[in-house]
Design a protein with these regions (language model features):
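ATP/NTP-dependent adenylation/nucleotidyl-transfer catalytic domains that generate, transfer
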Residues: 1-181
Length: 181
């Protein structure tokens, strides 16, 4: 009998298979909803992150929240506030919250920006990013970097990403799938 994460991931994989079949039947392209924060650290289930294109795959989670607020401010409440303010969760187990498994997204995104795209930020932006990173426990910081390194094999199997940032996964950043971390 499967237990824990292995059992939880069955639900996500079945959902992916169902959605791909439904998309196929309708003759439509399935869109992957993964984002750069989750993709970076492998916080997704293989074969649940399927699709023909990942529209928001190069946006950090904090950027997605900002984009949602911007859309609502400029076009009316298209995205219900309950969706934006809902605690992020993979919803594979009761009371599951992304930030309990990882860390609050502003801190995670700061670590990822430093690791992936540091040279593309202005000095002022780098100071803001560094200020957030300075608040992170060094062990948690190291854990996030380890997750980043270990997730390459998952990213290689994900839907193609529309590149927004200077360094997107895929063509913008390639490292061996298997390497010593």
């Amino acid at each position: 009998e499967l237990k824990g994460v292995a059992a939880e991931n069955i639900q996500a994989r079945v959902r992916g298979v169902f959605l791909m079949a439904y998309s196929n039947q309708l003759g439509n392209l399935m869109i992957c909803t993964g984002n750069k924060s989750e993709n970076s650290v492998g916080y997704f289930t293989l074969w649940d992150n399927c699709g023909g294109m990942s529209i928001i795959g190069d946006l950090y989670k904090t950027e997605i929240f900002d984009l949602c607020y911007w859309i609502n401010e400029n076009y009316g409440e298209i995205i219900p506030l309950e969706i934006i303010t809902k605690i992020p969760s993979a919803e594979l187990a009761p009371n599951m919250e992304d930030e309990k498994s990882l860390m609050p997204y502003p801190y995670l995104d700061a670590i990822l920006k430093q690791e992936l795209e540091w040279e593309y930020f202005s000095i002022e932006e780098q100071k803001e990013i560094q200020a957030l990173i300075d608040e992170v426990d060094p062990k948690e910081h190291a854990r996030m970097l380890k997750l980043l390194d270990r997730a390459e094999f998952k990213r290689q199997q994900s839907a193609p990403i529309i590149r927004i940032h200077p360094r997107a996964f895929g063509n913008g950043r390639k490292i061996p799938i298997v390497h010593k971390c």
